[in-house]
Amino acid sequence: MVVLALSGCSSHWGCADTTAERGEAGVRVRVEEVTGRPLDVFAEVVDWRLEPHPQVPAEGDQVHFRFRFDGADDMTDPAVDACAVDEERVALGCRTIHSYQAFGPNGSPIGDEWLAVADPERVTGVLFVPNDQSYVGPTCEEDAKDGGGPRPPEPARAGDRL
């Protein structure tokens, strides 16, 4: 009788990584989990403007934008990429924004952030990418036993067409 024993750590059988498709960027988006299922959370760019950052005014204009998350709570805390874009929707600068950042002074549900871009005069808007970036688990390569599964797309970055 031959007994074949395989350690979960040495076997890639049954472990698979999948990457979600990037969702349609917009001023107001419904956040999507990694499987593509929409959450009951909406992220919205309230407004934006070009102005010097008060802590580094010598660096010139940056993109200052205000945003809100409707439907988020302490248990969901999704995160989406925010990107300043040009007229062709090419990202000029991006950063990940978490829903917990959307709480301003005096209980306001509106947060604000800054995006530094190389050519601020090209900015025509700020868009959110709807894919939830709040959790990225280990890959099969990193942990063959417990890793794998659906993953969000790579974070948006300058040069991406949204």
Where would I find each of the regions flagged by the language model?
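C-terminal motif of bacterial Sec signal peptides marking the signal peptidase cleavage site
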Residues: A5-G8
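Mature extracytoplasmic domains of secretory-pathway proteins
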Residues: E51-C94
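Short, solvent-exposed, Trp/other aromatic-anchored flexible loops in extracytoplasmic proteins
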Residues: E87-G149, D160
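Short, structured coil/loop segments at alpha-helix boundaries
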Residues: R28, D61, R66-R68, A116-A118, ...
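Phenylalanine-focused residue identity feature
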Residues: F42, F65-F69, F103, F128
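Transition segment at domain starts
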Residues: S10-Q62, E142-R161
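Sec-dependent N-terminal signal peptides
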Residues: M1-V2
